[in-house]
Every structure is written in C-alpha cells, then in structure tokens.
Amino acid sequence: MTDGTSQYIDAKMPTMPEEASMHADTNRPDAIACLETDEDASAHARTSQERMSASGRSLSPRWLRIVSIIWSGQAVSIITSGASGWAIIWHVTQTEQSALMLSLLMMFSMLPLGLLSPLGGVVADRFNRKAVMIVADLGAGASSLVLALLVVAGTRSFALICLFATIRSVFSAFHAPAMTAAMPMLVPERHLLRINTLDQLLESISSICAPAVGIALYTAFGLAPTLIIEFIGALVACAALGLVKIPTVKVEEESTVAEQMRVGWDALRVHKGLVMLLGGLTVGLMAFAALGAIYPLMATQHFGADGTMVSVAEAISGTCMLVGSIVIMAWGGGRRLALLLCASAVLIAVPIIAAGLLPSTAFWIYAGLMGLASVFMAWFNGPLMTLIQQRVPEEKTGRAMGFFYALIGLAMPAGIAVGGVIAEWIGIPTFFVASGILFLVIGLFGYLFKDIRALDAPSQASKAPL
C-alpha cells in the first residue's frame, strides 16, 4: 500500500485520465484489504475474548451449565440454612426472652467470618477450590446434624447453640473466598457481575422466605427436624459441586500462612483504588448494618407501628433488594463498575435521609423509602467484588477475597454495636439522616479520586502483576 506522502504528491500533481484511473485501481484493493483485515482482527479479538474466562483461562463451552449446577446446589443450601437460622433465632427468642442473648447469638454468627476469612483465602489459593467448598459445606451441615442430635437427646443450652453458630460461621469463612475465587475461572468477564449478584439474589430470596419457613417448621416440628433439613441442603450443595470440574490454580512455593496473607493484601494494595473502595464499602456496610438493627425501633418508637406492620415493611425491603439484584443481573452493570458503586451510594443516601425526616404519621412512606434504598443496596458490593476478581491474578484471588469478606464480617457487628450507641445518643431519626449523609459523602467524593476513576479505565482491565 502506498504511504501517506506519495498519496499527497499524487493528489497535487496533474494526471491524465488514464493515469488517474490506473492509480485508483491500484489503490482500491489495498484499502479494501486493509479494512477487511481490521474487521477480521476485531472480530477475532471479540471471539477470543468470548472464549476466555474472566481470569484468562480457556472457557468451557458448557460454562453456563456448570455455573447453573453449582448455583442450584448453593440455592438449596442458602435457603435451608436461612430457614434453620431463623428457627434458631425463634428458639432463643422464646426460651431466653432476652435482647442481649439474641445480640450475642448474632455476634457469634458473624465474628468468625470476619476474623478467619483471610485464612480461608489462603486455603482457597493453596488447595483445589472445589474441594474446599465441599468440605466447608459438609462441615457446616454436619455441625447442624450434631446439634440436632444433641437437641433430641435433651441438650439445648444457649451456650451450646452459640458454639454451633460459631462453628457454622467458621466454615463460611472458608467457603466464601473459595466460591468467589472460583467464579472468575468459570465465567466470561462480561457476565462476572451478573454471577456475583446471584449470591445477593439468593440471600434476598432467603430473607423473604426463610423467616416464615423457619418459624413455621420450628412451630410444627421443633428445632431438631429444621436443623436436619439444613444438613440435607448441605448434601445437595455438595452433590452439585461433585458434578462439575473446577480448575486447580498453580500452587506457589511453600511459605508461612502470615506471608501468604500478606501476598493477598499486596495483590489488593497494588491497586490503590481498590483499597479506597474497600474502605468506603466497609464504612457503608457498618452504617447499613446499624440501620438494619434499629429499623424495628424506628418503626415502633417513631412511627408507632405494630408487629404486623413491621413484618410487612421488612418483606418490602427484602422484595426490593430482590428486585435490585434482578435488575443488575439483567443489565450487567456496564463497564464503569467503580462509578456504579459510587452512584449506588448516592442512590442509597437519598431515601435514607428522607426517611429520617418523615413525620411520625408517614410509616408506609418510610417502608417505601427503605425499600428503595434496598434496591440500590443490592448494587453496592457486587461491583467491588467484580473489580477485585478482574484485577487480582487467579492464584491470589482467594486471599484477596478473604480480606474482602473479613471486612464485611467485621463491619456488620461493629456497625451494629457502634451504631446502637450513636443512635441512643443523637436519636434514631437523626441517626438515619446522619447515615444517609455518610453514604452521600462516599458516593459523591469517592469518584473524585483519580485512583478510583482509574479502575474504570480500559487500561486497567488487565491484572497488574505484583
């Protein structure tokens, strides 16, 4: 093909018609060939990308079937576990009649996830992630079965229930990093946020169904049969995992657990924007956990709602979070995930601030506003999870996600404890307004930082080496 200079000279110099015709004939095929080559290269790039998983592995043509099998088993496990958890809560409510005891139970159910998830991430990167998930599911299910047998034998002390709640949370600390580290190896990058949102979707379904199912099963059959149902759900999840193949990552050289944890943190720290978003997410989850804990008090003390009204309002919030999860799964979240996270914080803030300013006669408006906040809360942590999976090498993803779940596991009980004290001090409606302003600051100012905006740049799509 002729270069740009000769084309310019040819255009300026007079030519005979025959020469012009001959010149055009020699240039046209080259131009067409160049365009065809560019189009072929672009099509080849798109095809190659579609054949690769988010972690850069060759993608199985049956990837959707594999993921569907895994998540079908997890769906059964999440719903049966949620029903069992509510049966335990109802049992403690009826037998102990103490808010302190319920708070302790919740603390034992959350803290191990926060404290042990970094270790769970090390295990997820060291061993086959499918095996880690199966052992974790079996361990959690077996602990419920043992507790059921002890209840049948007549042993049902509060201390024993807290012990088994702790054990279940320990197994969750190993299951969660392995699960989220496995997904990028199985799913195309453009569908990764959708798959990550499945967990939120199932949790939303569980939050709607589990209280009614768990309390109904407890009332009809007692605590032990409900715990056995959770064990059956764990077996279903393990059976589903047994039907699929999950690749094994390359194991690094032997090193201490502390050194391996540090490698996971360094994999996050190399992207300053990820660390900043993790900080914002942690603060936001602390605020939202506190709002969830005082939600019934706001309803009863400020609006004078009864138990039925509170139950309906809780169902509205759960349904709206389900709707938010479905929307993000259908949409896919777009390419600018850091912007999506910051925008969702703003969209969460507005209804929460409005809810704190309502008069005491506007309960149903309050329920609607909190439902609206729940829609956008479903968009809050999925983008960050996806950004971590996209940017951290697959052999370090488990450890990176371990820190992600550690922050979540610690943020929620810390938020409940600190938020309760602050709400007592400044008043519950004022606390709602303050929490909304906090979300507003996270959203509006977060995206002003260059390191956070850089996460949405095309050049950041590849995983940076350490």
Question: Model-predicted segments: where are they?
Answer:
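Intrinsic disorder in cytosolic terminal tails and internal cytosolic loops
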Residues: 1-60, 449-466
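Helix-loop boundary and gating motifs at the non-cytosolic
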Residues: 56-111, 266, 270-317
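Substrate-agnostic recognition of the 12-TM MFS/MFS-like secondary transporter fold
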Residues: 68-85, 108-122, 128-143, 160-219, ...
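Transmembrane alpha-helix termini and helix-breaking/packing motifs in multi-pass membrane transporters
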Residues: 89-95, 148-153, 209-229, 301-302, ...
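C-terminal transmembrane bundle of multi-pass solute transporters/carriers
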Residues: 115, 119, 132, 146, ...
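Helix-loop junctions on the cytosolic side of multi-pass membrane transporters
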Residues: 181, 185, 227, 231-256, ...
